[in-house]
A protein has these predicted regions:
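Non-heme Fe(II) oxygenase catalytic core, chiefly the N-lobe of the double-stranded beta-helix
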Residues: 2-240, 245-277
Length: 277
């Protein structure tokens, strides 16, 4: 794809691209916005470096892509900026958000379309990289009989497994979000099919006995985590990663304890996952 207002350099053949030639602190013109959107659709995750954003500018960039999402758990948010989630780990941390392969908040009935993570502080000796995986390729490289099987299945995504279990948070009124989604979802923009299960939130496949569900999910997890489907982003201060939750998974490396890593995430609302044959 030819770009006029931005420069795009692919990270790997499978997924990821670094974008340059744009200052995200400034209002985006229509052409720059459209080309950034196109780069995201083409590469599933896009990276920007050397960006200086206030919380308001971070939110303004996110709002160009849609209404902003409020996280369902009681994880830290920036005071007076409920749309900005604090992503932090240090010597006091007993867990780090995102250290399993996942798509963000897939337990919601309408999971986010994308997430925009802005990194401010990093460990002094490196580490804290984020891995991303192409879920189009995860589906497309399954054998045809397995593709057909998965296209007829749905799965339960349960927020209690993460927020109540790993994070130890008390459930909000009405409980943590819990939803049933197709195992293979159709991307609403590209029309391509992506595998849509993840270790964090998916608890079982509907209609299968537990041993069958567990075995199939584990096989799909292992397959979707194939290195050839991945890229790895090495963060620098003031870097941004913007990923498409509808067709990409990610995994945050926690290899820097007890050092500090601090970032801020804005998340864009999405729509209800669907499957089109």
């Amino acid at each position: 794809m030819a770009y006029q207002s931005i420069e795009v350099r692919k990270s790997t053949p499978a997924i990821g691209a670094e974008i340059s030639g744009v200052d995200l602190a400034q209002p985006l013109g229509n052409q720059a916005f459209q080309e950034i959107h196109d780069a995201l659709m083409e590469n599933l995750v896009i990276f920007f470096r050397g960006q200086e954003l206030s919380h308001e500018q971070h939110k303004a960039f996110g709002r160009r892509f849609g209404e902003l999402h409020i996280h369902p758990s009681s994880l830290s948010v920036v005071p007076e900026h409920r749309e900005v989630l604090i992503i932090k780990a240090d010597e006091k941390s007993t867990y780090v958000a995102g250290e399993e392969w996942h798509t963000d908040v897939s337990c919601d009935a309408e999971p986010p379309m994308g997430s925009i993570l802005y990194m401010k502080e990093l460990p002094p000796d490196g580490g804290g990289n984020t891995l991303f995986a192409n879920m189009y390729r995860a589906f497309e490289t399954l054998s045809p009989p397995l593709q057909k099987l998965c296209e007829g299945l749905t799965a339960i995504h349960d927020g209690a497994q993460v927020y109540g279990g790993r994070f130890g948070q008390a459930p909000p009124a009405g409980g943590f979000p819990r939803s049933e989604h197709p195992v293979v979802r159709t991307h609403p923009v590209t029309g391509r099919k992506a595998l849509y299960v993840n270790r964090n939130f998916t608890t079982r496949i509907v209609g299968l006995r537990k041993p069958e569900s567990d075995a199939l999910l584990e096989m799909l997890y292992r397959h979707s985590e194939t290195p050839e489907f991945q890229c790895r982003f090495v963060w620098q201060p003031n870097s941004i990663a913007f990923w498409d939750n509808r067709a990409a998974m990610h995994h945050a490396m926690w290899d820097y304890f007890p050092h500090k890593r601090l970032g801020y995430r804005v998340t864009v609302k999405g729509d209800k996952p669907f499957h089109r044959a």
